[in-house]
Amino acid sequence: MENKNFETGEKKKRSSITAENVAFVRALESCKPEGESICYDPYASRFLSQQYLMFMELAARDPSRIPFPGVHNSLSARVRYFDDFVKRSIDEGLEQLVILGAGYDTRAYRIEGLKDKVRVFEIDHPETQSVKMGKIKDIFGSLPDHVEYVSVDFETEDFGQRLLEHGYGRSRKTVFIMEGLIYYLPPKAVDEMLAFIAKNSGTGSAIIFDYVHESSIDRTDGICGVQCTACDQQAIKSAASDMAQQGEPYKFGIKEGMIEAFITKRGFSRVCNVTSEDYKKAYFRGINEKRPVCCLSYFVHAMVE
């Protein structure tokens, strides 16, 4: 639900659009003082165009300028929840981290413990990877040794084969992150991705991803009901057509109430489904208590059987 593209002028490459939208959310949230920011990413702003940076400065001074605040807050919570999951996994002996649809993800560079202990594989479209690698070189002077950049078109290429070619170890304890990814993939691609993970991961491996219900994609009105703000209803209502015009249409959702059955059928167990109420309670307390979240956004993690 990467909701708005502020870029004008020359049309950007399709995969980079979503990547920059999410980097904008992380960068804007990181402008808040400690104790108020839901997530923190010191590198996110380095991936933003001048127009995004200008808007970020305006929105940081005047939060009322933030478009679709519920969606923004849910995306910030997603970053935080996934960060926390990775940190716990490091403490529990993580050996590999695979980030599918990595975009401008910066976990490999900002989460303590990954550089020294964990091999990271960042997988995304070749166009996005090219931009990403250039930015990383600008920030750090060179590409880090602990990260492998794997270029894949998920709809036309075998990501598993490409991953193996880059040194992925089938027997190692691995976490697979699919953040802001699966609703852009056709069902067949999602099934193939999960099948590879289930069959090619070491003991204790896990997946974590976010998803929306099928109804959120298929319906054209009344999507959010009364739980989301009016502006967020409009954001989700128009998101599919907006992203389709930019080359990234929504294609996949999971039937309501069926997430555990969906996951276990594909070779996973110990399913934990996280609702907007759950992450609102976990992260939006004190000064953040009145910040709205979007009720359509769900997170889920599970263990490989």
Q: Model-found features: residue ranges?
A:
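Rossmann-like AdoMet
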Residues: 1-98, 104-150, 158
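Rossmann-like AdoMet/SAM-dependent catalytic core
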Residues: 2-5, 44, 216-305
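Glycine-rich phosphate-binding loop signature in dinucleotide/nucleotide-binding domains
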Residues: 89-93, 166-172, 201
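ATP-dependent adenylate-handling active sites, centered on carboxylate activation for C-N bond formation
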Residues: 111-114, 158-161, 171-173, 189-193, ...
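A short, conserved alpha-helix within the catalytic core of class I
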Residues: 147-149, 158-161, 184-202
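Short loop/turn elements that flank and shape the SAM/SAH-binding pocket of Class I
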Residues: 155-158, 166
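A short SAM/SAH-binding and catalytic strip from SAM-dependent methyltransferases
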Residues: 163-189
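Conserved beta-strand signature within the Rossmann-like core of class I S-adenosyl-L-methionine
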Residues: 175, 194, 199-216
